[in-house]
């Protein structure tokens, strides 16, 4: 295997007292928590795009990162080199999974024929590398937003030929995900939205993307893909308004097209921030609607109106997120994919390790704290007591449809009901959470 990160062999767990920057302080893959190992709980993945494709460019500057494989005049050979380096990184970091878009791993080429040939060639290589290293594919997806053909959307494009091109990419990416043993397939509508309503037919575009998703479901069953289909919500960027705004919006879309039993959600922390929600809110909403699937782990900046895709570094935030996940029973096919990028000034190749090690330790510590909260049941006892009235005869009759507005109005008058307010105890609960986090 190509050696690019030759300063280190493999990242290992050394414990909280370690000062080694190339060691985990909290992530012990084999530590058992609530009956599962830490590795089984977190199901960690590294993303191909930010980690191995982004060169550090932004809207105001050229690439700042040294990526030798991007300078290869033979782009296919460069993609092969990138695969070598990617799997060296994955193997040394010790994560079990990775994720990719189709054009992350292979050059798109100048025609659909070249696209298919290049993609299949690199998939052959990835298949071999998975066998060599034991690293698995958490999910695959298709990039139907970067190429200029998608400037007006992919499935929502006014031109059905563009719709067909997007279908071609998803067809190939789904088949590759199936072949590589991927456990999920993700659909993010990067340009499925609008810039202005002056040239947009909302109803038509909604019907187009609804049909596209139905076709994806049909293909899943046709090829026998056993993984989970996931939609990734995002409110805006690159379009002004995107149709998959947040978890609740996606659920409404799925219900409209009869897909709520077929597709779940892949929730990104930064996208929750852009939608004006907390990360915990989006996770809790998905769990309540039974569409929780997977997570893109990162963080945004509430002071900025765009996707900063920074690595997660808040144990406070992620403890509450982990608590929601554990309450729901944990991941099934999903996991924590680090959809995050180092900063433009982090030009040392080993900054990739520092970023991932720190983020993994944040999730590991958050898992331990959330597990303690769940085991102590303090929060759940208070929530149960708060809603205890709904277990009464009155509460059950309301929920079971045995009452009406009229009968309830009569009941209130007959019994002269005068319910007294009860404290929500928010400050007390926040103190309990902090006590667990900082103990």
UniProtKB/Swiss-Prot annotation:
Its EC number is 5.3.1.5. Its main location: cytoplasm. PROSITE patterns: XYLOSE_ISOMERASE (PS51415). InterPro entries: Xyl_isomerase-like_sf (IPR036237), Xylose_isom_bac (IPR013452), Xylose_isomerase (IPR001998). It catalyses: alpha-D-xylose = alpha-D-xylulofuranose. It is an enzyme of class 5 (isomerase). Binds 2 magnesium ions per subunit. SUPFAM superfamilies: Xylose isomerase-like. This is Xylose isomerase. It comes from Haemophilus influenzae (strain 86-028NP).
């Amino acid at each position: 295997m190509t050696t690019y990160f030759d300063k280190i062999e493999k990242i290992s767990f050394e414990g909280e007292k370690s000062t080694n920057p190339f060691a985990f302080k909290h992530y012990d893959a084999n530590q058992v928590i609530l009956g599962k190992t830490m590795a089984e709980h977190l199901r960690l993945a590294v993303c191909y795009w930010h980690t191995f494709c982004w060169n550090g460019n932004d809207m105001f500057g050229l690439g700042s990162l040294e990526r030798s494989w991007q300078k290869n005049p033979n782009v296919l050979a460069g993609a092969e080199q990138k695969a070598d380096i990617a799997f060296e990184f994955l193997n040394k970091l010790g994560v079990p999974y990775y994720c990719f878009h189709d054009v992350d791993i292979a050059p798109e080429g100048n025609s659909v024929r070249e696209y298919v040939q290049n993609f299949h060639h690199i998939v052959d290589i990835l298949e071999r590398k998975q066998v060599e290293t034991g690293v698995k594919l958490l999910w695959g997806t298709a990039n139907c937003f970067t190429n200029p053909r998608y400037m007006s959307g992919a499935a929502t494009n006014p031109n059905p030929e563009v719709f067909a091109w997007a279908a071609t990419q998803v067809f190939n990416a789904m088949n590759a995900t199936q072949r590589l043993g991927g456990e999920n397939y993700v659909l993010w509508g990067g340009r499925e939205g609008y810039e202005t309503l002056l040239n947009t037919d909302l109803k038509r575009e909604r019907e187009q993307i609804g049909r596209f998703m139905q076709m994806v479901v049909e293909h899943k069953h046709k090829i026998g893909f056993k993984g989970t289909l996931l939609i990734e919500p995002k409110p805006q960027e690159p379009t002004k308004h995107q149709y998959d705004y947040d978890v609740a919006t996606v659920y409404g879309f799925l219900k409209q097209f009869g897909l709520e039993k077929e597709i779940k959600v892949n929730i990104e922390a930064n996208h929750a921030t852009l939608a004006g929600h907390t990360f915990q809110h989006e996770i809790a909403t998905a769990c309540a609607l039974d569409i929780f699937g997977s997570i893109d782990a990162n963080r945004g900046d509430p002071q900025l109106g765009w996707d900063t895709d920074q690595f997660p570094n808040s144990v406070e935030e992620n403890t509450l997120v982990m608590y929601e996940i554990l309450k729901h029973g944990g991941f099934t096919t999903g996991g924590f994919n680090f959809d995050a990028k180092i900063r433009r000034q982090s030009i040392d190749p080993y900054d990739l390790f520092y970023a991932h090690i720190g983020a993994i330790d944040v999730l590991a510590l958050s898992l331990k704290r959330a597990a303690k909260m769940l085991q102590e049941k303090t929060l759940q006892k208070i929530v149960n007591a708060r809603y205890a009235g709904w277990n009464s005869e009155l509460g059950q009759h309301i929920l079971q449809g045995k009452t009406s507005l009229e009968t309830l109005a009569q009941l209130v008058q007959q019994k002269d009901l005068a319910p007294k307010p009860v404290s929500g105890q928010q400050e007390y609960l926040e103190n309990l959470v902090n006590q667990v986090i900082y103990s």
